[in-house]
Amino acid sequence: MDAARRGDTQPVMWTTRWLLLLPLLLCEGAQALECYSCVQKADDGCSPHKMKTVKCGPGVDVCTEAVGAVESIHGQFSVAVRGCGSGIPGKNDRGLDLHGLLAFIQLQQCTEDRCNAKLNLTLRGLNPAGNESAYEHNGAECYSCMGLSREKCQGAMPPVVNCYNASGRVYKGCFDGNVTLTAANVTVSLPVRGCVQDEACTRDGVTGPGFTLSGSCCQGPRCNSDLRNKTYFSPRIPPLVLLPPPTTPAPSTRTQNSSSTTSTTAPTTATTTIKPTTVQASHTSSTHETEHEVIQEEGSHLSGGATGHQDRSNMGKFPEKGGAQIPSKGGSDALGSWLSAILLTVVAGAML
């Protein structure tokens, strides 16, 4: 019986527990923060009929709204974000100036439901905005993108404006950049072009709470068509001059020169090497030939004429084999002297 009663009471206990937890869960769901949510890109994206109400996730206890307004001498626009945020409640306002482009940022965070609709997101007059017709044009021309989408602000598509000086400032430079606003985990970005004071700024920027305005400047008629990937320097800086690369002879010319050099010097080297070897090899034989040549030369001088040269050219050569041998002139003279001596002896004996 006790076991049966325990089995019957167990489902009742689980049901009772769920009934007790249900109000707590309902209270927790009811306590989720509700915030307005919208995005404005120089349009009416945050107008009352376009705003939505969202429930924030766990751990989110503030609603956020942020607005950034940008103004040049030719116009102004604003970007804004509303939604569930993070951080501490409060309000932050800041004004910025980038070479004559003015910006005003407001950030507001609150902890009540749908409390993030207090800021004025409409356009506001910022100095130096004024009546353009009241100023005289200074001759500079620039492309102007104030609140245009990126599709309408490409290259030479945006309108061209004439720059003028305002509030004691000289606007003769052209600007090309971007404005970026980040709030409630949403980032909004739009292009910015127009007349500015600086004529040679390079990727300059100003920042505020979740806000950035940055870009580059240039000088010249409509020079701000695209400065994102270009670098401009002040006219006071000397220009950079690129030197031409050094010229080198073609590979075929070097090959011909080297081959001609080798063919020219090779015989000289070979001749120089052979000469000492020949002299050393024939040194002993040439000594004997020189002595024999001196003797023959003396005989030739005594005999005289071309005969001496002829005998010297044939000296040191062995007689050819076969045939009659022709005696030299020196042998003929000796034979004549010997015959003369015999005849004289015979004549002398006969006389005695």
Curated annotation (Swiss-Prot):
Disulfide bond positions: none
Species for this entry: Rattus norvegicus (Rat)
Alphabetized UniProt keyword annotations: Cell membrane, Glycoprotein, GPI-anchor, Lipoprotein, Membrane, Repeat, Signal
Biological role: Supports cell migration. May be involved in tumor progression.
Keyword Hydrolase appears in the UniProt entry: no
Membrane topology: Lipid-anchor; GPI-anchor
Protein name: Ly6/PLAUR domain-containing protein 3
One BP term from GO: negative regulation of smooth muscle cell apoptotic process
Signal peptide: 1-32
Primary subcellular site in the record, as a coarse category: membrane
Tissues and organs where the protein is expressed, per its UniProt entry: Found predominantly on the basal layers of squamous epithelium. Expressed in the gravid uterus and on epithelial of the upper gastrointestinal tract. It has been found in tumor lines which metastasize via the lymphatic system.
UniProt xrefs under Gene3D superfamilies: CD59 (2.10.60.10)
Keyword field contains Cell membrane: yes
InterPro entries assigned: LY6_UPA_recep-like, Snake_toxin-like_sf
Residues lipid-modified (GPI-anchor amidated glycine): G330
Gene name as annotated: Lypd3
Sugar-bearing residue positions: N120, N131, N178, N185
Biased composition annotated in UniProt, kind: Basic and acidic residues: 286-300, 309-320
Sequence segments annotated as region (Disordered): 236-330
Self-association state and partner proteins as the record states: Interacts with AGR2 and AGR3. Binds laminin-1 and laminin-5. Interacts with LGALS3.
Domain UPAR/Ly6 stretches: 35-128, 142-224
CDD domains linked: TFP_LU_ECD_LYPD3_rpt1, TFP_LU_ECD_LYPD3_rpt2
Propeptide, chain numbering: 331-352
CC annotations in GO: membrane; plasma membrane; side of membrane
Pfam family, one: UPAR_LY6
Compositionally biased region (Pro residues): 236-249
